[in-house]
């Protein structure tokens, strides 16, 4: 009987940890009240890199990653993600916001040629570990974050 209880306890811990593997706590401060405030008061006026991937694929990869690993994972509040794809402009925008609507981040994905994408991440000044977050978003745009990019890139 005792082994049965131990097995059930271990099984429950395993299930709970596997269900929450991707849902790490997302920092909800600092934040800014509007998109314009965020862009005007962002780390380095936006962190930017070029990636060797089509912008549509990068956008879809980020959309998947944000949906799996950013949305609803705040320390004390919910985090909401939103996105907008503008194919006529060959660009996509992804946002993370607090439950009250304040902006946590803005990510731009823009085509700069065949299979070339400019990724720009806007984080509020004072955001801790901005470079680490930027590298993680670049990895996610490439579809290389196994925790958050469940499907393989197109």
Model-derived features with residue positions:
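Bacterial Sec signal peptide processing site at the extreme N-terminus
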Residues: 18-39
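C-terminal partner/receptor-binding element of secreted or periplasmic proteins
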Residues: 118-154
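A short, structured loop/turn motif at beta-sheet edges
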Residues: 51-57, 109-117
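Surface-exposed short loop/turn segments
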Residues: 72-114, 122
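Extracytoplasmic/secreted envelope proteins and their assembly/folding machinery
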Residues: 55-63, 106, 131-135, 139
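Acidic/histidine-rich, surface-exposed loop or edge segments in extracytoplasmic proteins
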Residues: 36-46, 115-122
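Post-signal-peptide N-terminal segment of Sec-exported extracytoplasmic proteins
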Residues: 39-81
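Sec-dependent bacterial lipoprotein signal peptides
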Residues: 1-24
């Amino acid at each position: 009987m005792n082994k049965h209880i131990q097995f059930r306890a271990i099984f429950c811990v395993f299930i709970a940890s596997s269900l929450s593997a991707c849902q790490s706590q997302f920092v909800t401060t600092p934040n800014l009240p509007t998109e314009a405030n965020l862009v005007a008061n962002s780390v380095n006026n936006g962190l930017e890199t070029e990636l060797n991937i089509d912008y549509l694929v990068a956008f879809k990869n980020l959309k998947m990653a944000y949906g799996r690993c950013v949305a609803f994972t705040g320390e004390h509040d919910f985090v909401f993600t939103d996105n907008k794809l503008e194919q006529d402009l060959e660009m996509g925008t992804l946002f993370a916001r607090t439950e009250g609507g304040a902006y946590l981040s803005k990510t731009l994905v823009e085509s700069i040629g065949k299979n070339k994408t400019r990724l720009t991440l806007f984080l509020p000044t004072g955001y801790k570990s901005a470079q680490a977050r930027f590298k993680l978003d670049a990895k996610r745009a490439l579809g290389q974050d196994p925790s958050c990019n469940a499907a393989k890139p197109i």
